[in-house]
């Protein structure tokens, strides 16, 4: 598939997600990075977003809870080019009933070439990157070209 450029604005659209055992570590990270996160547009799955919004006093667009379809909603936003960065504190030691949704979410993040952090260290690397505060161009699949070639 051919690639095209997609321009990310200086204010990124950041998705925040955490499995149940990782909600407190994500909250602690968000509290530590709160002032920087305020510069961006924040999205989160339902339970995580509600908790972060209340505790960190941040404006967050909340989707459904992950097991109720929130991971899939987030995947759709990624595919539509409406999410720039995914911060996903997942629990590598415990399986969740919606593991297929989680795998699909991570797959879409890879397909659409968005940065993904699955732990605190990587999240810090992403937040400290100069590209988080400036416009940045990424290469993404040319879906319009793909569709045109498949339907001609």
Curated annotation (Swiss-Prot):
Q: What are the UniProt keywords, alphabetically?
A: Lyase
Q: Catalytic residues per the record?
A: 71 (proton donor/acceptor)
The source's superkingdom equals Bacteria
Q: Which SMART domains match?
A: MGS
Enumerate the spans annotated as MGS-like domain.
6-152
List cellular component terms (GO).
Answer: cytosol
Lyase found in the keyword field: yes
Question: MF terms per GO, please?
Answer: methylglyoxal synthase activity
Entry function:
Catalyzes the formation of methylglyoxal from dihydroxyacetone phosphate.
> Matching PANTHER family, A to Z?
METHYLGLYOXAL SYNTHASE
Protein family: Belongs to the methylglyoxal synthase family.
Its protein name is Methylglyoxal synthase
Protein source organism? Aeromonas salmonicida (strain A449)
Q: Which gene encodes it?
A: mgsA
